[in-house]
Amino acid sequence: MATIIDGKAIAEKIRADLAAQVKELQSRGITPGLATVLVGSDPASEVYVRMKGDACNKLGMHSVKITRPAETTEEELLALINELNNDPAIHGILVQLPLPPQINADRVLEAISPAKDVDGFHPYNVGRLVTGKPTFQPCTPYGVMVMLQEAGVDLAGKEVVVVGRSNIVGKPVALMCLQRNATVTICHSKTRDLPGRVRAADVVIAAVGVPEMIKGDWIKEGAVVIDVGVNRVGEKKLVGDVEFAAAAERASAITPVPGGVGPMTITMLLHNTLEAAKMAGSGNR
């Protein structure tokens, strides 16, 4: 039976360390500030924004939630981003996706100052990630890397299969594994023989958004399974992209859903916001 990689416990440990660092910064007159921007009233987005704000407040960070109606124009949103870029009390800017159809999300994300891009989505920061330079790393992939490290998984020489190729998780997590000397295969909807690819993997990272798509008997004996997916089945049940119970019989370690990668995403957002505040305080932007 697999060891459960407890994302909640790892996140709590990291947040305790972050809280101590926030106090130290505050002693120098700097309080890390995060602005979250929500356009419209998507219920799931409202929950995510509230969770991010609550997490900031618990650490002693400054949190600002800015809501705009769904009919907000792209020009109005870009003007708001410009204001936040020039606000010295704000170190991180997060625009909650998805945005209404009249707004081009790429243009909005590119308008955020790279020094305040704590989501790691700006092309400047993506380019630095690709070339292996220090940068804000996207929060979910960063959380996955920290979980693997905490679980004692050394990726060097390992066969890693990433299922999913999104800009938010699949592509960046594959890059991060490559930088840690793994041999990486990215699978997607056009991949031939997905079960065969997964069966060859020492580490499986599932980020495709399809409930229990990765079957337990696809998992190699002793493999490590990181399940990024969060899918609602019925009214209350949450499941990942991996068939958890069956996979846990074969894997050496596995993340649960919920309680796995999810808590790490917000934790790494807090980490990035703290780093942005440190850079602003040192004038290194």
From Swiss-Prot:
Pfam families: THF_DHG_CYH, THF_DHG_CYH_C. SUPFAM superfamilies: Aminoacid dehydrogenase-like, N-terminal domain, NAD(P)-binding Rossmann-fold domains. Coiled coil: none annotated. NADP(+) binds at residues 164-166, 189, 230. Pathway: One-carbon metabolism; tetrahydrofolate interconversion. InterPro entries: Aminoacid_DH-like_N_sf (IPR046346), NAD(P)-bd_dom_sf (IPR036291), THF_DH/CycHdrlase (IPR000672), THF_DH/CycHdrlase_cat_dom (IPR020630), THF_DH/CycHdrlase_CS (IPR020867), THF_DH/CycHdrlase_NAD-bd_dom (IPR020631). One of its GO terms (biological process) is tetrahydrofolate interconversion. GO terms for cellular component: cytosol. One of its GO terms (molecular function) is methylenetetrahydrofolate dehydrogenase (NADP+) activity. Keywords: Amino-acid biosynthesis, Histidine biosynthesis, Hydrolase, Methionine biosynthesis, Multifunctional enzyme, NADP, One-carbon metabolism, Oxidoreductase, Purine biosynthesis. The keyword Metal-binding does not apply. Signal peptide: none annotated. PROSITE patterns: THF_DHG_CYH_1 (PS00766), THF_DHG_CYH_2 (PS00767). Its EC number is 1.5.1.5, 3.5.4.9. It catalyses: (6R)-5,10-methylene-5,6,7,8-tetrahydrofolate + NADP(+) = (6R)-5,10-methenyltetrahydrofolate + NADPH; (6R)-5,10-methenyltetrahydrofolate + H2O = (6R)-10-formyltetrahydrofolate + H(+). Belongs to the tetrahydrofolate dehydrogenase/cyclohydrolase family. Homodimer. Catalyzes the oxidation of 5,10-methylenetetrahydrofolate to 5,10-methenyltetrahydrofolate and then the hydrolysis of 5,10-methenyltetrahydrofolate to 10-formyltetrahydrofolate. This is Bifunctional protein FolD 2.
